[in-house]
Every structure is written in C-alpha cells, then in structure tokens.
Regions:
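Short, glycine-biased loop/turn motifs at secondary-structure junctions and
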Residues: 1-102, 107-141
C-alpha cells in the first residue's frame, strides 16, 4: 500500500493526512479517508484508475468500486469509478453520500424519507427515481 501513499504525496496531500496514511496502512482506513476527504480526492482524481485496478477486490467492502455492475441497497458511503453500471436503492430514513465518476452510469431509487447526496464528475450519468418523501441533492463538477 506504499504506492497509494506515494501517489497521494505526489498529488500534494497535506502533511497531517500523509502522516495518518503512514500510521494506518490498511485498506479500510484508506477508504474511510477517501470519504472524509472526498473534496481533495475528487479534485485530484484520486485514487487513480490504475491504483483501483491493482486493489480491486479489496476496496469494494469499504465502498470504492471500479467497473462494478449490479445493485446495492442502503449503503451509506459509495464511490464508483471507471465504467460502472449500477442501481442504488435507498429507503427507510437512510442517509448516504455517493460519488460517481468517469464513464459510470447509475440509477438511484430513493423512497421512504431517504436522504442522498450525489457528486457527479467527469462523464458520469445519473438517473433519479424518488418518491415525494425522499430528498436527493445532486452536485455536478
């Protein structure tokens, strides 16, 4: 995982976060850092597609998916990269943050008071289906 830290350093991650990465060298922690600092990550296109490819199979359980095809329900933190094609379902007061990048396509179904924040970057496409009780906030960069 030193290559992840090295790439973050090349992209001028702040010293505080660099030290956190050096101290906690595990995938779960790195993925949690992604969501806590997703503004920096999105601005610097981090993690890179080659890094995600290298660690495919290790990031998914922590919410980062590359070229994923399928349906996921009620997961609070998700990020899709590459050419993912997904359906995301949220209900029963679920609150979530979803980042969709590159060439990914997503259909998001929100109902029963779910609150979803979606960041759309690059050439990603999103279709929203929601009932009157759900709130969906979309930010396109």
């Amino acid at each position: 995982m030193k290559d992840i830290i090295q790439k973050a350093e090349e992209l001028n991650i702040c010293h505080e976060w660099q030290n956190k990465m050096l101290k906690h060298q595990d995938m779960k922690y790195f993925c949690e850092m992604y969501f806590k600092g997703d503004d920096w990550a999105m601005e610097h296109d981090f993690p890179t597609l080659p890094l995600l490819q290298k660690y495919k199979g290790q990031t998914e359980e922590h919410g980062l998916y590359l070229d994923y095809k399928g349906t996921i329900k009620n997961k609070p933190h998700l990020a899709f990269f590459g050419s993912s094609n997904i359906v995301l379902e949220y209900d029963n007061f679920q609150v979530a943050l979803v980042n969709i990048r590159h060439q990914s396509k997503a259909k998001i179904i929100a109902k029963n008071y779910a609150i979803i924040t979606i960041n759309i970057l690059d050439n990603a496409e999103v279709e929203i289906e929601k009932d009157p009780t759900a709130k969906v906030f979309i930010y396109k960069k």
